[in-house]
């Protein structure tokens, strides 16, 4: 049996707070036997045609014949029979083997490169827990990236995965060239290297690096410190000869193609020239057109300086693809991004804490606090956030991470970030599968510790609903998540067409996993980036009783749930909360 509360957005309380609804549930953590109750559905309306008394419909749970439920126009809802359900193969296996409480909540993003671009390598990553495959437009050709996208799509279709695709733009910042085709170059201490804007037709001289910015030689000064890839390698400018800049290596390291360059003078970052460059370059616009044509799920924009850039890009995507569900991710990796953080997050569909480049623009000791602040703002504004850059950097060359790296990953999980991202570790590292396994095992262990220790953080989640209907959805999800923790339920079910209510539940970070049922494949893949969500594709109707009965039947047949499991269900079609045991 089930107990439910239904709300209608037609209710109006002129400048009154939301009415406090008494909930007939205990607040202890013991499981609550709801079998003795019948389903209660309430609808109230202030429209002239309705009576002054609310309509109450009562029906037994599990019969599939709960009478007529009404939508906002007081018309009966047409019920359709879902014939199948799509779920990620790895999640299905985890649920069968380990149960609800052992499913991983933190999502994993893998950058695809030469080490992982083959179909078998991609499948190994998907089996290992990859939720999102990232393609970095700084490297490779569009034809190469197209082949990767095709393999990921084939993987989803043939093997039963739901891996989303994120395209990361290059951005307009100053960076190195492609190293003449070499995959990397080693800069040793004391070596003299030349950074030049020349275009070499013949093989370039030894220890010479191209720079993409024509004014580079004019802007740098002798004595400036040049940082490669956020400080992974450092040089001191010792001489300027026309378009060439001679530099001495002061901190040795590995040089990678198209690595970002920043230069410092008298202990401060030289920002003026970068500030004049556009956030989205002409190449980026061509890459964005490519991403739209290929139907990627996310586009990550580098070096975002303001919300205006995000809004412009969203309008551009909408004009080029009116039915597109592409989400825009803002990469927070500059001082300007931090200054305008809240407006950027509000405008975007999510954010990435790009710690490598961010650490080249602010003092290193400020990066941890900046990360925590970005994660917190994203959580408050209900936007997924990815912690990226150098999570397991040593595993590019070694099979085991450093203990400091494990602690760093643990902290990101403890901060309740939505996702963790591998960069070079999976793109060009020698142990991509092992690196992913480390992220997965650390995430599961820290999440389990958090639940065992009852760390229900007291983060204030501000109201974000822009309409009255959105505010009701928000209150429902907040209440459902709190009830789930208090009652110790096994899972939260959410039926959502656009994914909004699923994201609201994810924002609350409940103890139990969230089963998100949606009718659209693209929405399902997008939800795969958000904390705690297990996205399913399922055809459903507006009749919650029918949806639940058929969902129970389909999931029980696959061994993913069993009779007696306690579930709370919400829906963005009929704004409601239902609590029930699986029949």
Swiss-Prot record:
As recorded in UniProt, its EC number(s) are 2.7.1.40
Q: What GO molecular functions are on record for this protein? A: ATP binding; kinase activity; magnesium ion binding; potassium ion binding; pyruvate kinase activity
Question: What are its cofactors?
Answer: Mg(2+); K(+)
Q: Where does ATP bind?
A: 136-139
UniProt name for this protein? Pyruvate kinase isozyme A, chloroplastic
Please give the InterPro entries that the UniProt record associates with this protein.
Answer: Pyr_Knase, Pyrv/PenolPyrv_kinase-like_dom, Pyrv_kinase-like_dom_sf, Pyrv_Knase-like_insert_dom_sf, Pyrv_Knase_AS, Pyrv_Knase_brl, Pyrv_Knase_C, Pyrv_Knase_C_sf
- Cite the SUPFAM superfamilies for this sequence: Phosphoenolpyruvate/pyruvate domain, PK beta-barrel domain-like, PK C-terminal domain-like
Pathway per its UniProt entry is:
Carbohydrate degradation; glycolysis; pyruvate from D-glyceraldehyde 3-phosphate: step 5/5
Name any GO cellular component annotation.
chloroplast
State whether it acts alone or in a complex, and with which partners, per the record: Oligomer of alpha and beta subunits.
Low complexity compositional bias: what residue ranges? 43-52
Q: Which residues bind Mg(2+)?
A: 333, 357
* Location of this chain's protein in the cell: Plastid, Chloroplast
**Which residues carry the site feature described as Transition state stabilizer?**
331
Transit peptide from where to where?
Answer: 1-74
What segment(s) does the record annotate as region Disordered? Answer: 43-75
Positions of K(+) binding? 136, 168-169
| The family this protein is said to belong to | Belongs to the pyruvate kinase family.
**Which catalytic reaction applies to this protein?**
pyruvate + ATP = phosphoenolpyruvate + ADP + H(+)
Q: Give the main localization category.
A: plastid
Polar residues bias locations: 62-75
Q: Which parts of the sequence bind substrate?
A: 134, 356-357, 389
- Per UniProt, which keywords does this protein have? ATP-binding, Chloroplast, Glycolysis, Kinase, Magnesium, Metal-binding, Nucleotide-binding, Plastid, Potassium, Pyruvate, Transferase, Transit peptide
Which major enzyme category is it? Answer: transferase
């Amino acid at each position: 049996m089930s107990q439910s509360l239904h709300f209608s957005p037609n209710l109006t309380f002129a400048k009154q707070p939301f009415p406090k609804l008494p909930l007939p549930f205990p607040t202890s953590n013991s499981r609550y036997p709801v079998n003795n109750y019948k389903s209660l559905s309430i609808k109230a309306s202030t429209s002239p045609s309705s009576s002054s008394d609310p309509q109450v419909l009562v029906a037994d749970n599990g019969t599939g014949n709960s009478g007529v439920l009404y939508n906002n126009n007081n018309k009966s809802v047409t019920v359709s029979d879902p014939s199948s359900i799509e779920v990620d193969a790895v999640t299905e296996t985890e649920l069968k083997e380990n149960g609800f409480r052992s499913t991983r909540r933190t999502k994993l993003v893998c950058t695809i490169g030469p080490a992982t671009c083959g179909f078998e390598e991609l499948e190994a990553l998907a089996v290992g827990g990859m939720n999102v495959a990232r393609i970095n437009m700084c490297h490779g050709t569009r034809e190469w990236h197209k082949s990767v996208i095709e393999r990921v799509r084939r993987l989803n279709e043939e093997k039963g995965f739901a891996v989303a695709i994120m395209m990361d733009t290059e951005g307009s910042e100053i960076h190195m060239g492609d190293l003449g085709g070499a995959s990397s170059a080693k800069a040793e201490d004391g070596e003299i290297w030349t950074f030049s804007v020349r275009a070499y037709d013949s093989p370039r001289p030894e220890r010479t690096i191209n720079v993409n910015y024509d004014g580079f030689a004019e802007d740098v000064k002798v004595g400036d410190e040049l940082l490669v890839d956020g400080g992974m390698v450092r040089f001191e400018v010792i001489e300027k000869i026309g378009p060439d800049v001679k530099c001495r290596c002061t901190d040795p390291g590995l040089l990678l193609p198209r690595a970002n360059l920043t230069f410092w003078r008298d202990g401060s970052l030289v920002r003026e020239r970068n500030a004049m460059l556009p956030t989205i370059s002409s190449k980026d616009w061509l890459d964005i057109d490519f991403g739209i044509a290929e139907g990627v799920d996310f586009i990550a924009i580098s070096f975002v300086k303001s919300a205006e850039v995000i809004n412009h890009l969203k309008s551009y995507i909408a004009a080029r693809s009116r039915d597109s569900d592409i989400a825009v991710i803002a990469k927070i990796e500059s001082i300007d991004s931090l200054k305008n953080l809240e407006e950027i997050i509000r405008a975007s569909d999510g954010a990435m804490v790009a710690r490598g480049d961010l650490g080249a623009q602010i003092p290193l000791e400020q990066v941890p606090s900046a990360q925590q602040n970005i994660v917190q703002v994203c959580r408050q504004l209900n936007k997924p956030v990815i912690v990226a850059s150098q999570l397991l950097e040593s595993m590019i060359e070694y099979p085991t991470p450093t203990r400091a790296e494990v602690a760093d990953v643990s902290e990101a999980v403890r901060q309740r970030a939505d996702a963790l991202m591998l960069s070079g570790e999976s793109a060009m590292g020698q142990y991509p599968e092992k690196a992913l396994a480390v992220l997965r095992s650390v995430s599961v262990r820290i999440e389990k510790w958090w639940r065992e220790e009852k760390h229900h953080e007291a983060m204030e989640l501000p109201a974000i609903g822009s309409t009255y209907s959105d505010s009701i959805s928000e209150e429902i999800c907040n209440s459902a998540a709190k009830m789930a923790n208090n009652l110790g339920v096994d899972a939260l079910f959410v039926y959502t067409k656009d994914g909004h209510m699923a994201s609201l539940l994810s924002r609350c970070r409940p103890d139990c996993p969230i089963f998100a049922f949606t009718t659209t494949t693209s929405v399902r893949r997008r939800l795969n980036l958000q904390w705690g969500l297990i996205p399913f594709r399922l055809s459903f109707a507006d009749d919650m009783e029918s949806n639940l009965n058929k969902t129970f039947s389909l999931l029980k047949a696959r061994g993913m749930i069993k009779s007696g499991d306690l579930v709370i269900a919400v829906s963005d079609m009929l704004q409601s909360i239902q609590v029930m045991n699986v029949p």
